[in-house]
Regions:
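Interface/linker segment at the passenger-translocator junction
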Residues: 336-352, 359-542
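Outer membrane beta-barrel translocator domains of Type V secretion systems
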Residues: 423-424, 428, 458-658
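Extracellular repeat-rich scaffold modules on cell surfaces
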Residues: 1-46, 74-131, 179, 184-187, ...
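Extracellular beta-solenoid/beta-roll
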Residues: 3, 53-62, 68, 73, ...
């Protein structure tokens, strides 16, 4: 009791198991001080009752929480007995080594600083501790036990964590910097590294013989570590969920992988591609793999420019491949006649053991180069005798299943294949068809409605003879090839409506109802279909088109010109055109175009019932092309149209009229 301090000297052990009330510090110079509660160290307040390790050790044989800080003025050891747990406020080791021993748990709740820590046994939990080492030795030496690091900053000039015994390392939201290895394992060690809320790019080295490192990447984790292992050691990786990421920036060798997260090959550095080599088995838990790939002809090994996943064992489950495309694209069917071959294209995944056909699949229907090439690259699977062993990237083990990107073709049954089917020789005769025009009616002086339905008739016969397989092109291309006909049909749809309106002027003039100034508006619609005179093998696409528009116009002036009456006006029509390419399930697309048409109109009516109608129009078109799921391309176009119509109306009996044009 009193205001003094307790100083432990001598090599023996001293035990404090009661309640002490001294107010000063506790300092251990030599030997060991044994305690079973925080009250054993006196009753001083937090500011003047710290524990100072001055060369001796602290042995804890009870469970308790202390608000004291622990200072090290020399190397020191804190031991916690089995089944006991002791927590402290902060530790400050300076340049000295702090050793945790005993089978119990020691917790540092509120950080502090340390330069070298050794875990001999039991569990050590460090929360918000700043650890920095300029020493040649590792910052954290783990012989046995469980090391939990939560928050804080950890940096080391040399190795960060050196593991010499069976242990578990748990990292949660720790800032890590290491000039050496982030983690290094010695011989005959089995260790588990678990990560949560963690980004780490520390190198991992498993150099010892018969050592095993199991890595569990959990919630909100990105593992960007380069991994290196000896032939006698094992690294097993488990990406536990879809917020678990593994970034690969160089060739990486591991033994077994379970992927319920995301494996990401980092963007190319100087056009260098990387391999993930898996010595054992791979299990896909609906995870993803992102690879960088040059879309080219492929074929020869040195032309298959892509990151690769190479698995010597078996594959289970399913995995989605996300290909980041580069290059200008090319037709991978390089054999004479474009006959498909297992050597063509670009290998992404090779398996030495067994794998189902759907073990790997693309995240989309096909891969393309965007605007650089029209080809569809799809993923095809080869197995057993189908595999071209000249494309073997597994080394000494034959490839049993090969997943390759190749140019997609259609065979005689409509199936997607990676080249020309030699049996694809059935003939076809088709009649071609052309564009259709809508027919509609409108009524009213100033308002009106128009509706129409049209079916186009072609101008010639389709190709005859042998059908030939051909490459599939990207879906937006079918809309691009249909776009001129679709926009022409929409333009005719607008002009036809304006021409009908100009015809109203002539009718009103004959009935003496015409006005020098007249305003009108009407809603118009049409449904049309188009059938190409080319067959599908020659990229002939059929489509259905739905047009809707609002037409607003005026005749702003009229004047006499000799024996003629002249009317001048303007029209603005806005609407949309929806076009659905229908005759190719593998290349179908849907196009929505918003249109704005500005027109100047003129009508000349002769006293002898002759008339001339003229329309000069400018159209602006903006829209998008869709596949089954999303927007895939944009449409932007414009047009100029000139329409001149000459006619005369003849009156027949019983109020019948005939009007040649």
């Amino acid at each position: 009791s009193g205001n003094g301090s307790l100083i432990k000297k001598g090599q023996g052990d001293m035990t404090l198991d009661g309640i002490n009330s001294y107010q000063g510090i506790t300092r251990i110079d030599q030997g060991n001080l044994r305690i079973n509660s925080d009250q054993s160290l006196g009753g001083g307040n937090k500011n003047n009752s710290d524990l100072i390790m001055n060369g001796g050790g602290l042995k804890i044989f009870g469970s308790f929480a202390s608000d004291r800080d622990v200072y090290f003025n020399a190397d020191g050891d804190i031991s916690v007995d089995k089944d006991m747990s002791s927590s402290w406020n902060k530790i400050h080791t300076g340049d000295y080594k702090f050793t945790k021993s005993g089978e119990g748990e020691l917790i540092v709740r509120n950080g502090g600083d340390a330069s070298e820590i050794s875990l001999m046994n039991g569990a050590l939990t460090l929360i918000n501790l700043n650890m920095n080492s300029e020493k040649q030795d590792a910052l954290l030496n783990v012989n046995n036990g469980v090391l939990n690091i939560i928050g804080g900053d950890v940096s080391a000039k040399n190795d960060l964590i050196y593991i010499t015994g069976d242990s578990t390392i748990n990292l949660d939201n720790v800032s890590i910097k290491s000039s050496g290895n982030g983690m290094r394992l010695s011989d005959n060690v089995q260790s588990t590294l678990s990560l949560r809320n963690q980004y780490t790019d520390m190198p991992i080295l498993v150099e010892g013989k018969n050592s095993i490192l199991n890595i569990n990447a959990g919630d909100n984790t990105t593992l960007a570590s380069n991994m290196h292992k000896s032939d006698e050691s094992t690294i097993n990786l488990n990406l536990m969920n879809n917020s678990s990421n593994w970034v690969i920036s160089q060739r990486t060798d591991v033994d077994n992988v379970r992927n319920s997260g995301n494996i990401i090959f980092s963007p190319l550095n100087k056009s260098e591609f990387n391999n993930l080599n898996i010595k054992g088995d791979y299990s896909g838990g609906n995870g993803t793999i992102t690879l960088n790939t040059v879309l080219n002809k492929g074929g020869d090994k040195d032309q298959q420019l892509s990151d690769k996943v190479l698995i010597k064992g078996n594959v289970s489950g399913e995995t989605v491949l996300k290909v980041v495309p580069q290059g200008n694209g090319d037709n991978t069917a390089s054999a004479p006649g474009n006959i498909f071959s297992s050597r063509d294209g670009i290998s992404l995944v090779q398996v030495g053991g067994d794998a189902a056909d759907n073990a790997f699949k693309l995240d989309r229907e096909y891969i393309s180069t965007g605007t650089k090439s029209p080809y569809q690259y799809r993923l095809f699977t080869y197995r057993g005798d189908q595999v071209d062993q000249q494309s073997n990237f597994l080394g000494d083990k034959p490839v049993n299943v090969d997943f390759r990107l190749q140019t997609a073709y259609l065979d005689s049954s409509g199936n997607v294949v990676p080249g020309v089917d030699p049996d694809y020789n059935n003939s076809n005769n088709e009649n071609g068809n052309g564009t259709g025009n809508d027919n509609g009616t409108g009524n009213g002086n100033g308002t009106g409605n128009g509706t129409g339905n049209g079916t186009g008739n072609g101008t010639g016969n389709g190709n005859t003879g042998e059908r030939k397989s051909r490459p599939l092109i990207v879906r937006q291309a079918s809309s691009y090839l249909s776009l001129p006909a679709a926009l022409s049909n929409y333009s005719n749809f607008v002009l036809d409506n304006i021409d009908r309106r100009l015809g109203d002027i002539y009718s009103k003039n004959n009935n003496k109802q015409i006005k020098d100034f007249d305003f009108y508006y009407r809603f118009i619609t049409s449904s049309d279909s188009y059938k190409s005179n080319l067959d599908l093998d020659n990229y002939g696409y059929d489509f259905k088109q739905k047009n809707n528009a609002m037409s607003i116009g005026t005749n702003w002036t009229a004047f006499d010109y000799g024996n003629n009456k002249v009317f001048l006006g303007a029209n603005y029509t806005f609407g949309d055109s929806r076009t659905n390419v229908t005759n190719s399930s593998q290349e179908s697309s849907y196009m929505v175009v918003n249109a704005n048409t500005f027109s100047l109109t003129g009508t000349l009516i002769n006293v002898n019932d002759y008339y001339i109608d003229g329309v000069l129009s400018y159209g602006l078109y903006n829209g998008h092309i869709y596949n089954n799921r999303e927007k895939i391309s944009r449409v932007k176009a414009d047009s100029f149209d000139l329409s001149i119509e000459f006619g005369k109306r003849f009156d027949l009996v019983n109020s019948l009229e005939i009007e040649p044009q």
